Amino acid sequence: MNLQDKYEAIFASAKPKILTEKTYFDRLIDDVNDKRSGITLLIRPNRVVVEKINEVLSDFKKIEPQQYYYPDTDIHVTGLSIISCYPDFDYRSIDINQYIEVIKQSLKNCKPFSLNFRGLTASLDCVMCKGFYDNSTLDLIRNNLRKDFLKTSLQQSLDKRYTLETAHSTILRLRAPLQDKKAYIEVIEKYKEYDFGTW
């Protein structure tokens, strides 16, 4: 299944459930006692792309102001989650330089690539920009990271939650019941093929 088909399948599955209030809420977003942390290799979009995302988010804010909107500094594509977030993770327990060296090794000889955010999709708890990449470099980087970290004794939890195959960016997360389910779906569909830009 190609990326477009994956994104379409996610929304096709979620849409009827959203309209019948079968959504999920992230109850930890506002929890001051949430101490989970981990290590993730992130890919950040440029300023132009982020500004376009904010323009789209402003449409959602008009109808769903109580939801969680990612700040500019948190908008990203996950390259790969090296250590999945968990409550007792302590950065002082690892040598971060060793992780940096493995990542550098994984990136060595990889060609440049571009990412394009084109359109929105949604699951039961969030709205995402659909990300597309122009060659196989991102897949190669992810596979290199998996292979190179598995050769070490470093703490890691690669693909523990799921095997990452997309290049999406979550930009809105539900933290309360939707006030207007129909309008929410309409905004998603309005921007279903919107070109946020390439970087």
Model regions and ranges:
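Histidine-dependent nucleotide/RNA phosphoesterase domain, centered on the 2H-phosphoesterase fold
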Residues: 1-199
